Regions:
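Extended C-terminal regions of large enzymes
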Residues: 353-424
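A glycine-rich phosphate-binding loop feature that marks nucleotide/adenosyl-phosphate handling sites
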Residues: 256-265, 313-317, 334-342, 357-365
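Core structural elements
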Residues: 11, 59-60, 68, 308-325
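Non-catalytic, polymerase-adjacent accessory regions of viral genome-replication enzymes
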Residues: 1-38
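Short, solvent-exposed helix-loop connector elements
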Residues: 182-185, 296-310, 321-333, 350-355
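A conserved non-catalytic segment of reverse transcriptases
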Residues: 171, 247-319
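Conserved polymerase palm-domain catalytic core
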Residues: 42, 49-64, 68, 100-264
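Short amphipathic alpha-helical coiled-coil/interface segments
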Residues: 39, 43, 337-345
Length: 424
């Protein structure tokens, strides 16, 4: 098994994946663009070290990133060399586990995604299972029990050297401010092996849910169970919580785990509402608030960037966000987001013109008559009032922003939903 993992063809495939994913370097400072040259010159030595059990992974670099819902998420960034080896292990092991994983598990798996999880949840609701148990595992990636995980791996992996290498990666120290702290638990996010290991751990939960006959969807550590009554939901919630904490040795966040009605539930940034007797998918309010905050940051009046640069940034954000939420019924949401952003862009443009003379010249160029251009260019009204004025709304209208490169949320959403309709 280890020989196949360290085979040149497998390592070449892993190398391409690591280089493609880019990312910052680890504690040794080596970058992804240096990795191919390193492997060319050190392949035989590296292979021998690992085969003889003499290889020792470097500590991971601790990084804290803000979570979308508040707080921080801890990442452990391995060196690019360790990233290469972890990727080689993961891509060799993944097909072996795929045939055993649950059909209701959608995260970090080939040909599976968040949309499929949400659409499956919609089917459960439509079938009458309208009580939702939203499970929240407290600091899951940081608290995975190593012994239980290794016990699970033992069932699939017979090669003791491969098992030892994986354990070394689990136990690799974490460097923070120059100090290395040893790890006794967890499989921190940031490494190529972590997603597969997390699914192996939670596959036990999947099997237990299936054994009990529950309807559920799981995406990584985000799991929702669908039942028909509140009484059943409370019973299931208590039973599964006990199983997770006693059998899997994981902690359920009691404050965030809840039983809710679909309209009050959230799944991967989506929620649901009932329309004409059918459960429809919508964008969760928190997701809308987060994108508003992100766009607000980009369109700050005085952040040192031109309106053109802001539009370029917005375009990337809009395309990614709409592509993710395209399965939701969200026409009015997209229109309202555009309305708010165009107002902020008008403020940016008015600020960019700065002086009355420049404002007057630009208003005239955009078709505003001379008297109105003179009146508004000398106005002492605040930016917000100017941005909402009929004059500026007329001068800097939707067509103007389209010419500047801002197509907007609604236009991209319309194009994507139209494309989906034509495909199906």
């Amino acid at each position: 098994m280890l020989e196949e993992i360290l085979d040149r063809r497998n390592l070449e495939k892993a190398l391409k994946a690591v280089i493609s994913n880019k990312g910052s370097g680890g504690v040794d400072g080596m970058q992804t663009d240096e990795l191919r040259d390193y492997l060319t010159h050190h392949y035989q030595v590296l292979k021998q070290e690992i085969s003889e059990g003499n290889y020792r992974p470097s500590p991971v670099r601790k990084v804290l990133i803000p979570k979308a819902q508040g707080g921080t998420r801890m990442l452990g960034i391995p060196t690019v060399k360790d990233r290469l080896l972890q990727q080689a292990i993961a891509q060799w092991l993944s097909p072996k586990y795929e045939e055993h994983f649950s059909k209701n598990s959608y995260g970090f798996r080939p040909n599976r995604n968040a949309h499929q999880a949400v659409l499956q949840a919609q089917q459960y609701l439509q079938s009458g299972k309208t009580k939702v148990i939203e499970l929240d595992l407290e600091k899951f990636f940081d608290t995975v029990n190593h012994d239980r995980l290794m016990h699970s791996l033992n069932k699939m992996i017979s090669d003791s050297r491969t098992l030892q290498l994986i354990r070394l990666y689990l136990r690799a120290g974490m460097m923070e401010e120059g100090m290395v702290n040893q790890r006794q638990e967890g499989t921190p996010q940031g490494s190529p092996l972590s997603p597969l290991l997390s699914n192996i751990v939670l596959d036990e939960l999947d099997k237990e849910l299936e054994k009990r006959g529950h309807s559920y969807v799981r995406y990584a550590d985000d799991c929702s169970i669908y039942v028909s009554s509140k009484k059943a939901a409370n019973r299931v919630c208590a039973g599964i919580t006990e199983y997770i904490e006693t059998k899997l040795k994981l902690k359920v966040n009691a404050a965030k785990t809840k039983v809710s009605y679909p309209t009050g539930s959230t799944l991967l940034g989506f929620s649901f509402y009932k329309y004409k007797g059918k459960w429809e998918i919508r964008i969760a309010e928190k997701s809308i608030e987060r994108i508003k905050a992100k766009c607000k940051l980009i369109t700050q009046r005085s952040n040192g960037k031109s309106t053109k640069e802001k539009i370029s940034q917005l375009k990337q954000v809009v395309v990614g966000w709409v592509n993710y939420f395209v399965i939701a019924r969200a026409k009015s949401v997209m229109e309202k987001l555009d309305e708010g952003i165009r107002t902020r862009l008008r403020i940016c443009k008015w600020n960019e013109w700065k002086r009355p003379k420049a404002r007057r010249r630009n208003l005239l160029r955009l078709g505003i008559n001379k008297s109105k251009a003179y009146q508004w260019s000398n106005s002492s009204k605040g930016f917000c009032r100017i941005a909402h004025s009929p004059i500026l709304c007329s001068a800097l209208n939707n067509a103007y922003w389209s010419m500047q490169g801002y197509q907007g949320f609604y236009q991209h959403y319309h194009n994507r939903t139209k494309l989906q309709t034509s495909l199906f």
